[in-house]
Amino acid sequence: MFYLLGLRLLKYITFRMAYATIFAFLLSLIVGPYIILKLKKLRADQILREDGPKRHLSEKAGIPTMGGILIFFCVFISLVFWSNILNVYFLIMVFVMLGFAFLGFIDDFLKIKKKTSDGLKARFKIYGQIIFSFFSVGILYYFGGEHVSVIYFPFIKSFQIDLGLFYIPFGMFILISASNSFNLTDGLDGLAIGLSIVITGALIIIAYLTSRADFAAYLHIPNIKGSEELVIFLGALLGGSFGFLWFNAYPAKIMMGDTGSLALGAILGMAALILKSEILFSILAGVFIIETMSVIIQVLVYKKTKKRVFKMAPLHHHFEELGWSEMQVVIRFWIIGLIFAIIALSTIKIR
């Protein structure tokens, strides 16, 4: 809204990004207690897995879920004020955010209604993810310009692969994989949101560099016209995420639920697609990929041998079973996530 006023100060990306971040953060602190209280009154409690860590059944009982509502409400309001709402990348990102959040909301609602950890049936969840990812990646492919289907590789300046129409299923795979990986990782207070903050911060840097023709030319990365609005979008997401972490830090007063985790993964995955950072995203999301692989390995090995590789999957529960405290697991995973982000950002210059 402010951007459309045409004020000179609002033309500066860094100014709008800073205030989109601050606005979303402060709004989270203001409306957070009200949303938490409202969810408690509605008895929207987190439904815990019976096969999860036993201490979670007592420690996390009664904590409201659907915290994604808090994140995305604050992000959306901030974006209305600070973004160019006519920018195509802004519209794609909002579509992904609302679509995947809606899917997660249905899943959370069914869990609460049925009082079970089984919400939306897996096949219906996948169908929903396929539909939303197909339309969002399809729109990106149509409006994204001549290089939209090109994959750029770190370390190698001249090596590129143009997938053509196959970029659409490739992009869908990234969105769905990211969405489900974030969902699997959201099991401890502050874990998923803290890692998301690290990735969001890294993507803000990448978005700013790609929006500037001078920096893009110097670093030999694509200059993406219009990607400056991703800086604003991700800034608002950063502020909303910090605000949510304020209440989600141990001991959590609210959990993000599938409303938050499914959408967060898809949002960051879509940002990576727009910024032509698909390969870098696989490094940035290293912790999420490791968590997902731990589940896949556990299931496959157990089916064949009836033995478990890990004491419990996903991997963060394995370390809990080894005796690590919840905060030890969370902070150590944050550190590893930060290292992955540093590695990913360092590859931008090494070409």
Curated annotation (Swiss-Prot):
Cofactor(s) for this UniProt protein: Mg(2+)
Entry EC no(s): 2.7.8.13
Any GO MF annotation of the entry: UDP-N-acetylmuramoyl-L-alanyl-D-glutamyl-meso-2,6-diaminopimelyl-D-alanyl-D-alanine:undecaprenyl-phosphate transferase activity
GO biological process, one term: cell wall organization
Subcellular location(s) per record: Cell inner membrane
Transmembrane intervals: 17-37, 62-82, 85-105, 130-150, 158-178, 190-210, 230-250, 254-274, 279-299, 328-348
Keyword check for Nucleotide-binding: no
GO cellular component: plasma membrane
Keyword vocabulary terms for this entry: Cell cycle, Cell division, Cell inner membrane, Cell membrane, Cell shape, Cell wall biogenesis/degradation, Magnesium, Membrane, Metal-binding, Peptidoglycan synthesis, Transferase, Transmembrane, Transmembrane helix
Catalytic activity entry: UDP-N-acetyl-alpha-D-muramoyl-L-alanyl-gamma-D-glutamyl-meso-2,6-diaminopimeloyl-D-alanyl-D-alanine + di-trans,octa-cis-undecaprenyl phosphate = di-trans,octa-cis-undecaprenyl diphospho-N-acetyl-alpha-D-muramoyl-L-alanyl-D-glutamyl-meso-2,6-diaminopimeloyl-D-alanyl-D-alanine + UMP
Membrane disposition: Multi-pass membrane protein
Pathway linked to the protein: Cell wall biogenesis; peptidoglycan biosynthesis
Similarity comment: family membership: Belongs to the glycosyltransferase 4 family. MraY subfamily.
Role according to the record: Catalyzes the initial step of the lipid cycle reactions in the biosynthesis of the cell wall peptidoglycan: transfers peptidoglycan precursor phospho-MurNAc-pentapeptide from UDP-MurNAc-pentapeptide onto the lipid carrier undecaprenyl phosphate, yielding undecaprenyl-pyrophosphoryl-MurNAc-pentapeptide, known as lipid I.
Xref: HAMAP family: MraY
NCBIfam families: mraY
Protein's recorded name: Phospho-N-acetylmuramoyl-pentapeptide-transferase
Species the sequence originates in: Borreliella burgdorferi (strain ATCC 35210 / DSM 4680 / CIP 102532 / B31)
Lineage, top ranks: Bacteria, Pseudomonadati, Spirochaetota, Spirochaetia, Spirochaetales
